[in-house]
């Protein structure tokens, strides 16, 4: 009686849902508007936070590029492992609606914790790291947990006779994802770089706005609560699949010697599970085997937000007319291009290839997508080869780098013991030709450097440390009767935001305070040298210099992306003479050269990712599609694990690493093509013709019970 009552209640709720209002006189239920807005805000929240994450690790937490890349991909991988947990909770316990709400709350808490961790005044660096990691963990649980629920929940809102509307809904849903991605990757880098807070880039705001968007997403979703169809949990098919496989393995292990041999190892589950379920799992396993090479594609694809962003920081970002793009904004190209490429491929390229009588099967498209992604990394390699020409690499063990500034009134000669580093005389106030390598006998070495000037030799005892860069300043004594050696440690690592570095040498007899933009530095009198300051790229025509008695206005000109400048300030009558020298070359490779690699990678994504999902769904029974979705998400997760391992373990130059990934993907695409050649397409819908459902839950009819196998399924061509 109780069960009958429950059924009546469920039926009543269902009828009520059926009568829910439609959107603007269409067959679309009003409820999907809340779901689409929720998805837009959630994707804005996720991609906005992720866009600035690598630079946050490097500039705020002060991690090196390899650790930053590793943690970035560890987080990305975790975001694709947690959907399994979300699907399990939704299907077995809470249902999709409650799962989305509860995990969205976890998501919001993660964003808030992450934003608080980006406030400099909250604790020390250990607290910032702890809050950041806790926040990212909660975000990964939230975004991954709701990932398998939201789209499926949206599909549940449609009646069975509104198939076209449901299909169009998924297109709208996908558009909302890309719209959120594009806008967030434009806006959050602006919040990071153009808004200053706590004396630097405003990461707290860049993370806080995505947090606010996630709060809006949650509020919008809850607001539509009374309009949704809410299906109760039906049990997780992935759990049943795992139990069936586990039973087959254990039963085979226990009884293989006692019982007759069976045609397939899964047939050992027949004692407990239906023939139909076993047959469906066999079909799924055939597809999952093809998934084995796929993580390598995602290993390349997900480096847009890590290695490619770091490459962009070392490039010229000026498009002219005052339009300067930020390195973390380049990721928006992927979302923009995919919106352009999908119709181009569907309505242009694929039909044209068909006219050439070339049959593009899904597996051929996926293999082609892999090759395109490999070409993207070949393009990235070519760009990197030119980019590194503007970079001064830190010296290896038992080596230092040194450059010399001759601030004397005539030529000088510098001699290092046993090393002919500077063979030619150095002219006064001449710009150094660059850093020279100085071999050392150990981790550090005291060297007697001989400086020759006007026929006199002066000996300087200087200590050099391995892996460090130095500037040796040679200037006259206060009485101008000799030479003084001043060895200064140099900062040679380029800014990860593309900013310029500048320092000042004061040859004036008075102390000087210099203001460049919002930065102020002090240079002591008589050849004092200021600290390095970082300033945004731009024209600085009115820098202010204040001495003990006067105030001067100097023209520093353009301080370009990634350059290191040394400016010598000298007294010249009633003015200050300015000599600007470029210690490290500006970023002269334009960021536009990254566009080809984004084009190749996005084209590869269209052919690989979209086609891969289409292929997977076409080759599995309806009841097993969630299992394949879980398997697909796992390939993304393992792809990020590959990058994590390479970033932390390989220790190779960046262009070599790019080339390695390209070569690995080419090799994997060949393996995948061979596997695809031997794969035979089947029609899962034919299962309904081979099986007759009865009260037992899918037993095969007796005439086919013994001989049914995948061989009975209708086949199509290979590859």
UniProtKB/Swiss-Prot annotation:
It comes from the Eukaryota. Residues 695-719 are annotated as: Disordered. Optimum pH is 7.5. Glycans are attached at residues 66, 481, 513, 532. It holds the Pfam family PTR2. One of its GO terms (molecular function) is tripeptide transmembrane transporter activity. It is found in: Apical cell membrane; Cytoplasmic vesicle, Phagosome membrane; Cell membrane. Keywords: Cell membrane, Cytoplasmic vesicle, Glycoprotein, Immunity, Innate immunity, Membrane, Peptide transport, Protein transport, Symport, Transmembrane, Transmembrane helix, Transport. CDD domains: MFS_SLC15A1_2_like. One of its GO terms (cellular component) is apical plasma membrane. Residues 389-594 are annotated as: Extracellular domain (ECD). Expressed in kidney, brain and gut. Also expressed weakly in eye, gill and skeletal muscle. It catalyses: a dipeptide(out) + 2 H(+)(out) = a dipeptide(in) + 2 H(+)(in); N-acetyl-D-muramoyl-L-alanyl-D-isoglutamine(out) + 3 H(+)(out) = N-acetyl-D-muramoyl-L-alanyl-D-isoglutamine(in) + 3 H(+)(in); glycyl-L-leucine(out) + 2 H(+)(out) = glycyl-L-leucine(in) + 2 H(+)(in); glycyl-L-lysine(out) + 2 H(+)(out) = glycyl-L-lysine(in) + 2 H(+)(in). It is a multi-pass membrane protein. Residues 62-69, 121-125, 191-201, 302-334, 389-594, 648-657 are extracellular. PANTHER family: OLIGOPEPTIDE TRANSPORTER-RELATED. This is Solute carrier family 15 member 2.
């Amino acid at each position: 009686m109780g069960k009958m009552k429950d059924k009546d209640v469920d039926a009543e709720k269902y009828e009520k849902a059926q009568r829910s209002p439609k959107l603007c006189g269409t067959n679309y239920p009003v409820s999907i508007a809340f779901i689409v807005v929720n998805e837009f805000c959630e994707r804005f929240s996720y991609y906005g936070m992720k866009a600035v994450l690598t630079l946050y690790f490097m500039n705020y937490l002060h991690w090196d590029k390899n650790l930053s890349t590793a943690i970035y991909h560890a987080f990305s991988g975790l975001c694709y492992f947690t959907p399994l947990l979300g699907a399990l909770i939704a299907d077995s316990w809470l249902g999709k609606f409650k799962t989305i709400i509860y995990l969205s709350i976890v998501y919001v808490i993660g964003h808030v914790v992450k934003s608080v961790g980006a406030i400099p005044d909250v604790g020390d660096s250990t607290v910032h790291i702890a809050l950041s990691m806790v926040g990212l963990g909660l975000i990964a649980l939230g975004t991954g947990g709701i990932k398998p629920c939201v789209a499926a929940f949206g599909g549940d809102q449609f009646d069975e006779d509104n198939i076209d509307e449901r299909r169009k809904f998924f297109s709208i849903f996908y558009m909302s994802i890309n719209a959120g991605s594009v806008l967030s990757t434009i806006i959050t880098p602006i919040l990071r770089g153009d808004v200053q807070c706590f004396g630097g880039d405003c990461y707290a705001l860049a993370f806080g706005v995505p947090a606010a968007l996630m709060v809006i997403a949650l509020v919008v979703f809850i607001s539509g609560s009374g309009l949704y169809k809410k299906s109760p949990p039906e049990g997780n098919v992935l759990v049943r699949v795992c139990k069936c496989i586990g039973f087959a393995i254990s039963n085979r292990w226990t009884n293989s010697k006692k019982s007759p041999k069976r045609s397939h190892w899964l047939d050992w589950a027949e004692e407990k599970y239906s023939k139909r379920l076993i047959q469906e799992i066999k079909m799924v396993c055939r597809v999952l085997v093809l998934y084995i090479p796929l993580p390598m594609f995602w290993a390349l694809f997900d480096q847009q937000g890590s290695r490619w962003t770091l490459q962009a920081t070392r490039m010229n970002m000026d498009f002219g007319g005052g339009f300067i793009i930020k390195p973390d904004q380049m990721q928006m190209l992927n979302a923009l291009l995919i919106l352009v490429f999908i119709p181009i491929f569907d309505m242009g390229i694929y039909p044209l290839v068909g006219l050439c009588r070339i049959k593009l099967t899904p597996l051929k498209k996926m293999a082609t997508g892999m090759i395109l992604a490999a070409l993207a990394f070949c393009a990235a390699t070519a760009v990197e080869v030119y980019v590194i020409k503007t970079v001064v690499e830190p010296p290896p063990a038992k080596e230092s780098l040194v450059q010399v500034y001759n601030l004397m009134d005539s030529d000088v000669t510098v001699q290092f013991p046993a090393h002919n580093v500077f063979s030619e005389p150095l002219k006064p106030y001449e710009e150094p030709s660059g850093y020279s390598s100085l071999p050392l006998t150990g981790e550090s070495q005291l060297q007697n450097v001989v400086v020759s000037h006007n026929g006199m030799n002066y000996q300087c005892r200087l200590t050099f440390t391995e892996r460090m860069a130095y500037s040796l300043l040679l200037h006259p004594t206060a009485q101008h009767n000799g030479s003084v050696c001043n060895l200064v440690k140099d900062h040679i690592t380029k800014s990860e935001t593309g900013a310029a570095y500048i320092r000042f040498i004061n040859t004036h007899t008075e102390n000087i305070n210099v203001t460049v933009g919002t930065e102020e530095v002090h240079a002591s009198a008589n050849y004092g040298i200021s600290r390095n300051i970082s300033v945004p790229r731009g024209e600085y025509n009115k820098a202010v210099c204040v001495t003990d008695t006067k105030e001067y206005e100097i023209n520093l000109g353009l301080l370009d992306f990634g350059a290191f400048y040394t400016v010598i300030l000298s007294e010249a009558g009633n003015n200050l003479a300015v000599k600007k020298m470029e210690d490290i070359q500006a970023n002269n490779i334009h960021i536009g050269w990254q566009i080809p690699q984004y084009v190749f990678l996005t084209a590869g994504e269209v052919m690989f990712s979209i086609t891969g999902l289409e292929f997977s769904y076409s080759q599995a029974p309806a009841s097993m599609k969630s299992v394949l979705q879980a398997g697909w998400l796992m390939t993304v997760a393992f792809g990020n694990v590959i990058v994590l391992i390479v970033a932390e373990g390989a220790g190779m130059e960046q262009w070599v690493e790019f080339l390695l990934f390209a070569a690995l993907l080419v090799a994997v695409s060949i393996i995948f093509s061979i596997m695809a050649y031997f794969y035979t397409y089947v029609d899962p819908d034919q299962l309904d013709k081979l099986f007759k459902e009865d009260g037992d839950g899918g037993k095969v009819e007796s005439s086919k019970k013994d001989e049914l196998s995948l061989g009975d399924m209708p086949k199509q061509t290979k590859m």
